[in-house]
Each structure stands twice: as structure tokens, then as C-alpha cells.
Swiss-Prot record:
PANTHER family: CDK5 REGULATORY SUBUNIT-ASSOCIATED PROTEIN 1, MITOCHONDRIAL TRNA METHYLTHIOTRANSFERASE CDK5RAP1. It comes from Rhodospirillum centenum (strain ATCC 51521 / SW). Binds 2 [4Fe-4S] clusters. One cluster is coordinated with 3 cysteines and an exchangeable S-adenosyl-L-methionine. The keyword rRNA-binding does not apply. It comes from the Bacteria. This is tRNA-2-methylthio-N(6)-dimethylallyladenosine synthase. Gene3D superfamilies: Methylthiotransferase, N-terminal domain (3.40.50.12160), tm_1862 like domain (3.80.30.20). The gene is miaB. The lineage of its organism: Bacteria, Pseudomonadati, Pseudomonadota, Alphaproteobacteria, Rhodospirillales.
Length: 466
């Protein structure tokens, strides 16, 4: 008998990938994905612990599930409620205490054991908590991906965990030590995805450019070598990777940006702060100038490269002048996109124990607004610089308007255009006509093959007057 499975995914692309693999693990038990929790036989909340608000959202959602679970029980049925991901890893016991109707709690390294957990939950032997780091890698036990990809783009996990131990971050504690999948398995999974119609693969890892997987030739492969071998898969038109660390941006990977046309000219390279004292307090293990030099080398290899980044404002002890150093770095680098946040203390991290140095919320809010104004101006200028130029766009879904398709260009901008549905899944030249805050729109080019690039982000910053 078929059963309905509803998975709600919070946070990063790695969680999106993990949710798909959870569905693969549960498929042999008869579970099929459904789009809503109402009527589901199992609900999994695949959680994120990066920010406090994300964690509290989980408890709010668990409260909304309780009456659904009770209603099912009243009719003689059962809804299994499970919490997975990083909140589960960090707060397993607290989840069971605050939400005793939860049947299962499991971390991101143990979801391959879901069949055993489900059996225990069904037997009714109490809440199941499985947050230990297993000796065996989950990748050794996961089945091949089951359902066909939902579109022409797919995520592929190649690396997990982090050994950097930034003082504000919970990832080393929730995801564990760095682990790289063997290159042969990555290549085989990528080949299967391409055979199923995928044209673009994004390689995932908490610290993806720290990838050092066992190669089929007996040597250790870095991410650059992995990218080169992926590019040899016939039909794989685009390769991306995220998230990267400046210290792991080695010469081999930078050279791949210059020499592998399938590797897209867009990189997410977090820096967090532009001030050296704050970077040291964060345990980032690099200076602002180290970051500048990495960016310079990358742009020398690929002049049309665009960057996005992460920034934290109001880190404990941050002064006005130290925040000004971040604004200066942003102005110098120029970003096509960026993500910025107020510092949020995560329990158990060293930064949370920096008593007496916490920045007032009002100051954090002022700094965040100033930074976001600068970043928005840069993004607007970058998008505006694309107008009149032609981009190859991978159409991956229908747009909101009839007859409209939506896709992404090389620099990750969403691009809208009127186009027939037969172009879904194809890379098509689009002449950009209009730039919007978070997207572009244009017209499909017929009989023209121009791969012009937008101006470099530095120029975009100057045009924005920042």
C-alpha cells in the first residue's frame, strides 16, 4: 500500500539534496512524495540551524502539525512526525521535550538509517533519537537516486562537514568533520543525472572547494580535477559549485575557471567581514588582503567572473571603524549578489561566550541597512549592465505569465522571456531588454549566437556611484 511522504526543507542547497535522498531511502517502504502535510503518513522537517529564527520556525511548524497528527489518530490512522537536519543534530533532546508528539529525530549523517528508525517508531517504543555520528559514511549506504530529476538542473553532494571551526558557526558540530566522496561515485552519479536529462549540475559541500576525494587512479583529486573530469561527460553543459572558502581556492581550481568552458563564471565566496581583527576573532584564518588576492587571481583567470558573498554585521566587539572596513572591501570587490545578516549567537559556539562584547541590536540593524544599501546598488548596477547584451539561458520552468519561460543565465540571474515550452530544458540565447531588482527579462534570439558578457562587477560598482 502506498503511503504519502511530505518533506519540508529549510535552509541551504545541501538540505535540498538531502531531502531528495531521504525520499529515495523511504521509497522501498512504499512512501511517495506529496505536496502538503494534510493527509501525509509521514512528515519530515529537514531543518537548518544557521540562524536562531530558522530554529524557532521549526518549533512553530511542529505546533501546527500536532492537530493534524491528532486528527489522523482520531480516525484510526497515524502520521509519523520527524525532525531531521542540523536543528535535530544540535537540539535532539530539547525537541523531544518541547514537542513530545515528535516520533523521530535524526541528524544529517544518519538519514540512511531511516528504515530502521521508522520500524522503531511504528513499534511505539518511544521517541527515536538518532544523532550520533556513525562510523560508516551515509554515502556508502544510500541507494541510487530514484525519482527522475525535477528539471534540467540538479544538485550533487560531493563534500560534507567543515574543519574550519569559525567561532560563530555550528556547522562543524552539526555536520561533522570534512568528508569527500570518492571521485568515481561522483562521476557515476553525475552521468546518471545527465542521462536523465540534466544539463546543469551544482556541486555541493559545506566547504566544497576543500574537496579531496579518492580518485579512480589511486591519487587524491581536488575540486579542480573533479570539475575537469565532469566536463568530459557528454551532455553536461554547465557546472557550478557552492559554498567555497577563500583558503581552499587553489591554483588547480582557479585554472579550471580559465580552461573549462562548462564551469560557470559565478562563484559564491564568503568573506564575512572586511576587518582583520574581526576575521581573526571569527577564526577565519585569512585576512582581508588574502581575500582580495584570491579574487584578483580568479578574475585574472576568468575576466567575466562575478561573485557573491556572505557578510555578518555586529559580530561581538565590532566597532564602527571595523564595520567601515567591510564597506570598503565591498566597494573594492564589487558583488553581483550577496547575503548579509545580523550576528546571531548560536549556542555552544565560542562567539556566543564573548560576554560583554555583544553589539546592541539597534547598532546591528543600522549597519545591516547600510551594507544592504551598498550591496543592492551593486546588484542593480550589475543587472543593468546586462541590458542590450545576449546571455545563454537554461530554461528550467514555466514563468508566472502565460507563454513565458524562466531560466538562469551564467551569472545566476533569473531570466524571463516569452518562449515556446519546447525550449524547456534547453540553453537558448536571450537578448536582455530589462533589468529588475532580482531578475532580467528579454527576448529569445533566433539565428544569432553571441555570448557577450556584462561589464565586470568593479565597473558596475562605479556606475552605481558606490
Amino acid at each position: 500500500m502506498k503511503k504519502k511522504l511530505y518533506i519540508k526543507t529549510y535552509g541551504c542547497q545541501m538540505n535540498v539534496y538531502d531531502s531528495g535522498r531521504m525520499a529515495d531511502v523511504l521509497a522501498p517502504l512504499g512512501y511517495e512524495p506529496t505536496d502538503a502535510p494534510d493527509g501525509a503518513d509521514m512528515v519530515i522537517l529537514n531543518t537548518c540551524h544557521i540562524r536562531e529564527k530558522a530554529a524557532e520556525k521549526v518549533y512553530s511548524d511542529l505546533g501546527r502539525l500536532r492537530p493534524l497528527q491528532a486528527a489522523r489518530a482520531a480516525t484510526g490512522g497515524r502520521m509519523i512526525v520527524a525532525v531531521g537536519g542540523c536543528v535535530a543534530q544540535a537540539e535532539g533532546a530539547e525537541i523531544m521535550m518541547r514537542a513530545p508528539h515528535v516520533d523521530m529525530v535524526f541528524g544529517p549523517q544518519t538519514y540512511h538509517q531511516l528504515p530502521e528508525m521508522v520500524a522503531r517508531a511504528v513499534r511505539g517504543t518511544g521517541g527515536v533519537v538518532n544523532t550520533d555520528f556513525p562510523v560508516e559514511s551515509k554515502f556508502d549506504s544510500l541507494p541510487e537516486e530514484g525519482a527522475s530529476p525535477a528539471g534540467p538542473s540538479a544538485f550533487l553532494s560531493v563534500q560534507e562537514g567543515c574543519d574550519k571551526f569559525c567561532t560563530y558557526c555550528v556547522v562543524p558540530y552539526t555536520r561533522g568533520a570534512e568528508f569527500s566522496r570518492p571521485a568515481a561515485r561522483v562521476l557515476a552519479e553525475a552521468a546518471r543525472l545527465v542521462a536523465d536529462g540534466v544539463a546543469e549540475i551544482t556541486l555541493l559541500g559545506q566547504n566544497v572547494n576543500a574537496y579531496h576525494g579518492d580518485g579512480p587512479d589511486g591519487t587524491t583529486w581536488g575540486l579542480g580535477r573533479l570539475v575537469r573530469n565532469l566536463a568530459e561527460i557528454d551532455g553536461l553543459a554547465r557546472i557550478r559549485y557552492t559554498t567555497s572558502h577563500p583558503n581552499d581556492m587553489d591554483a588547480e581550481l582557479i585554472a579550471a575557471h580559465a580552461e573549462v568552458p562548462q564551469l560557470m563564471p559565478f562563484v559564491h565566496l564568503p568573506v564575512q567581514s572586511g576587518n582583520d581583527r574581526i576575521l581573526q576573532a571569527m577564526n577565519r584564518k585569512h585576512t582581508a588582503d588574502d581575500y582580495r588576492r584570491v579574487v584578483e587571481r580568479m578574475r585574472a583567470a576568468r575576466p567575466d567572473l562575478a561573485l557573491s558573498s556572505d557578510f555578518i554585521v555586529g559580530f561581538p566587539g565590532e566597532t564602527d571603524q571595523e564595520f567601515a572596513d567591510t564597506l570598503r572591501l565591498v566597494t573594492e570587490i564589487g558583488y553581483a549578489q550577496a547575503y548579509s545578516f545580523k550576528y546571531s549567537a548560536r549556542p555552544g559556539t565560542p562567539a556566543a561566550a564573548m560576554d560583554g562584547r555583544q553589539v546592541p541590536e539597534s547598532v546591528k540593524a543600522e549597519r545591516l541597512e547600510a551594507l544592504q544599501q551598498l550591496l543592492t546598488a551593486q546588484q542593480t548596477a550589475f543587472n543593468t549592465a546586462c541590458v542590450g547584451r545576449v546571455q545563454p539561458v537554461l530554461f528550467d520552468r514555466r514563468g508566472k505569465k502565460p507563454g513565458q519561460l524562466l531560466g538562469r543565465g551564467p551569472w545566476m540571474q533569473a531570466v524571463h522571456a516569452e518562449a515556446p515550452e519546447r525550449l524547456l530544458g534547453r540553453i537558448v540565447e536571450v537578448r536582455i531588454a530589462d533589468a529588475h531588482a532580482n531578475s532580467l527579462s528579454g527576448t529569445v534570439v533566433v539565428g544569432e549566437h553571441v555570448h557577450a558578457h556584462p561589464v565586470a562587477p568593479e565597473t558596475a560598482s562605479a556606475e552605481a556611484g558606490v
